[in-house]
Amino acid sequence: MAKEELIEMHGLVDEVLPDSRFRVTLDNGHKLVAYTSGKMRKNHIRILAGDQVSLELSPYDLSKGRITFRHIAGRGPGPAPRQSR
């Protein structure tokens, strides 16, 4: 499956499920089960209930998704600001 076939959506994490899965409600009200992407797992990015996330959905199965980004209020995508010592 090519990347251009994926559907990008935004949603809210309702519940943390076992095995690194999450129950997510999309902005349009659709509910699905999602898992974290490999880069998020590799960088130990924690996702909790109530977090705003971006997901990728396959057009073939809209009941499953992959979480690609966790949105933090007041901060956009990009590197974290460096703290001076």
Swiss-Prot record:
Q: By its UniProt entry, which Gene3D superfamilies does this protein fall under?
A: Nucleic acid-binding proteins
Where's the S1-like domain? 1-72
Subcellular localization is given as:
Cytoplasm
Question: What is the first-listed, main subcellular location in coarse terms?
Answer: cytoplasm
Listed under GO cellular component are: cytosol
Report which superkingdom the organism of origin falls in: Bacteria
Q: By its UniProt entry, which Pfam families does this protein fall under?
A: eIF-1a
Q: Which residues form a coiled coil?
A: none
Supply the alphabetized keyword list: Cytoplasm, Initiation factor, Protein biosynthesis, RNA-binding, rRNA-binding
What PROSITE patterns does the entry give? S1_IF1_TYPE (PS50832)
List the GO molecular function terms.
ribosome binding; rRNA binding; translation initiation factor activity
Task: Write out the similarity annotation.
Answer: Belongs to the IF-1 family.
Q: How does it assemble?
A: Component of the 30S ribosomal translation pre-initiation complex which assembles on the 30S ribosome in the order IF-2 and IF-3, IF-1 and N-formylmethionyl-tRNA(fMet); mRNA recruitment can occur at any time during PIC assembly.
Q: Which PANTHER family match?
A: TRANSLATION INITIATION FACTOR IF-1, CHLOROPLASTIC (PTHR33370:SF1)
Q: Which HAMAP family match?
A: IF_1
Report the function annotation for this chain: One of the essential components for the initiation of protein synthesis. Stabilizes the binding of IF-2 and IF-3 on the 30S subunit to which N-formylmethionyl-tRNA(fMet) subsequently binds. Helps modulate mRNA selection, yielding the 30S pre-initiation complex (PIC). Upon addition of the 50S ribosomal subunit IF-1, IF-2 and IF-3 are released leaving the mature 70S translation initiation complex.
Protein name (Swiss-Prot/TrEMBL): Translation initiation factor IF-1
Species of the source: Polaromonas naphthalenivorans (strain CJ2)
The root-end lineage is: Bacteria, Pseudomonadati, Pseudomonadota, Betaproteobacteria, Burkholderiales
Tell me the gene name.
infA
